[in-house]
């Protein structure tokens, strides 16, 4: 009887707890397992890992809930989008370079948003570590190879999830509607489908962003044709594919360097995109967990 009563009591407590949540969100944990996180109140002490998270919260009007922006690796060289500059300037004093777990604990957050690698032993600690301390965690699904097929819809889900969590659903829906409107406008204004490669220069070869990457999905949503599915392409393979357009991925201040390098490779002179000067630089953070930059 005691066991039955205990089970019944625990079951009631679980139901009450679920009923107390104003929203429940699907995400993943440090073990890549799908989990549900519930919110009974709007987070007030948020650690936003990387600029794209801070920009998304600014766009939603929730930047005052941020207690720390964590710049990781190359983030320190990036600028916020111009429309968010005023709010971003107010975040400078609470911006950190590569927070440690100990520093994060001392900030007493109630919510942490980041990549999969944010929540490991080299980052801020595992999701389990934080969840046991009553801190919710959210991992962007297109970070660190979490999904086999990255899509624009994944980033729209991130924006909508943030809207639900911070009770800014109208604002998040407007952002997503604007993304879809921009896609339709671009499709209607462009000509024939282009043969496209999205490449990152790796020295003697290129990393290729194929249809399973967010960059590839973006091209295809705009009715472009991603013409290779290999993740690594040699010069010879690029010549054989002969794309009409190349989007060249760069990281921070190396935009002109990357352009100069690809145009100075003699072996590629016969490629249509090179001959016709149709190589367009695109910074990594616009195609990798871009948030509102998409």
Per-range role (PLM):
Residues 10, 122-202, 229, 278-294:
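Extracytoplasmic substrate-binding proteins
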Residues 47-49, 67-70, 111-115, 137-141, ...:
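Structural recognition of the beta-strand scaffold that forms the well-ordered cores
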Residues 74, 208-234:
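Alpha-helical, coiled-coil/dimerization segments enriched in small aliphatic residues
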Residues 118-132, 250-263:
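A ligand-binding cleft/hinge motif common to bilobed small-molecule-binding domains
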